[in-house]
Amino acid sequence: MINEFIAKIPKAELLVHIEGSLEPELLLQLAQRNKIKLPYSSVEQIKVAYQFKNLRSFLDLYNAGMQVLVKSEDFYELTLAYLRKAASQNVRHAEISFDAQAHLERGVKLETMIMGMTRAFQEAQKEWQISANLILCFLRNLTEDAAQKVLLQAVEFKDSIAAVGLDSVEMNNPPEKFKAVFDLAREYGFYTVVSAGEDGPPEYIWQALDVLKASRIGYAVRCVEDPDLMNRLNLTATPLTICPVSNVKLQVVKSMQQHPLKKMLEQGLCVTISSDDPAYFGAYVNENFSAASAAMKFRKADVYEMAKNSFLASFLESSKKEKLLSELDKFYAQV
């Protein structure tokens, strides 16, 4: 019963890496088209490879997979495939992260990436009435200077990029390392999102809030270790994009039963659910809702609250938010 409700409720997805939505079939197809040699020759072999042990082994696989993204058409096909799937799950708006630096270092131009992805946005809006924004993420294992160079390129595409973000390996890469580039990004008018408190300590969440002035925090599960931080997040209603299946697959938490999402929700935090890297974790947004619900016994009211939070936490303009919130409330009133 709750799974049917999850499937039908309008929602936004706010933390999804486009490179992480690369399904095995498309990976093989793009590798063949671009003459990229892969260590796999079949979809089955890729599916076996997608069973990883931890964040580092996952990132190795993830970085190898994205080598097949070369031309604008590749980014277009990948993005359109994700948006088709998201629309089928009643995602009405998506905010899609991409790792520009990982592509730039392979000689792919920023314009190539953005042209492909925004063309998919336009087509998806027309075909399935799903809207989308782009978030350009800086890789935190690289330098702040490297991030700043990309930011200066991104300014040319300000109309196509809603926000900048910070992702990749968290440990020993504190948010404060990127203060200057985030200050500059805000001056240019970008929203800011920061992944923090996944495998990094609660202190990184404080830094994301106070040093980088993040509009939204990704993962953030370790906030429950710090009561003062929980109070702060509650008072400020800072949106948190939680990826439950990712957290279990990467062993950030031992099991879904031990996931702190329910506690965060009960304590009034502004939590939303996203898929992170759906192709690698075998779970898009609805599967994330369903897996969390099975372990945490969500009521319809909980699911509604998180769907509402997802629209409120988006970077859509107010009129579009209001329209989607109205659609959500109309749906909820009829169940």
Segment roles from a protein language model:
Residues 195:
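Short HxH-centered metal-ligating active-site micro-motif
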Residues 1-190, 199-204, 211, 216, ...:
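Metal-cofactor-binding active-site regions of metalloenzymes
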